[in-house]
């Protein structure tokens, strides 16, 4: 098992965690950030950003469909009906998420922050273990910032379904 010591350990690379890690790195502190998924958190990877991209695509499709109607709209006409190819829309959304994720990772790197992929398991108040067995990494820090985000909760009076969606 390898051991890594640092001044600041941030657990969670969502909007709270990566901003804290970047700032610590900018201030010259030896900083490590641990993320179990992709840098950017729920908002960037599967929540706000991808949702807004899909809403924008739906709005654009709706506007184009109006132009495709007989006679067009605003003097703009499109021959034939507007067509949505969902696989193309999803690929476009995924490209946005990938680009922003790479941007967050670049900001961390440029600030001198080490990004470790994995799930942090506390061994004591200032030590975490990532991974298992001989490949595990033990990180000991002087300071620990918990920025592990949130998880969606289904409310008993508002079940997930056709009109209620979750980021999961």
Region locations from a protein language model:
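Glycine-rich flavin
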Residues: 2-6, 22-29, 34-168
């Amino acid at each position: 098992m390898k051991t890594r010591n640092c001044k600041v350990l941030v657990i969670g690379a969502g909007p709270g965690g990566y901003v804290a890690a970047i700032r610590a790195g900018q201030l010259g502190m030896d900083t490590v950030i641990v993320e179990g998924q992709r840098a950017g958190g729920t908002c960037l990877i599967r929540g706000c950003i991808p949702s807004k991209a899909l809403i924008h695509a739906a709005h654009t499709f709706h506007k184009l469909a109006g132009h495709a109607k007989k006679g067009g709209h605003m003097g703009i006409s499109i021959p034939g009906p507007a067509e949505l190819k969902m696989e193309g829309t999803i690929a476009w959304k995924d490209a946005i998420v990938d680009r922003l994720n790479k941007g967050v990772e670049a900001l961390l790197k440029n600030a001198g922050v080490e990004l470790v992929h994995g799930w942090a398991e506390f061994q004591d108040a200032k030590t975490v273990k990532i991974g298992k067995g001989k490949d595990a990494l033990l990180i000991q820090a002087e300071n620990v910032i918990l920025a592990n985000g949130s998880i969606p909760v289904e409310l008993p009076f508002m079940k997930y379904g056709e009109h209620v969606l979750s980021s999961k």
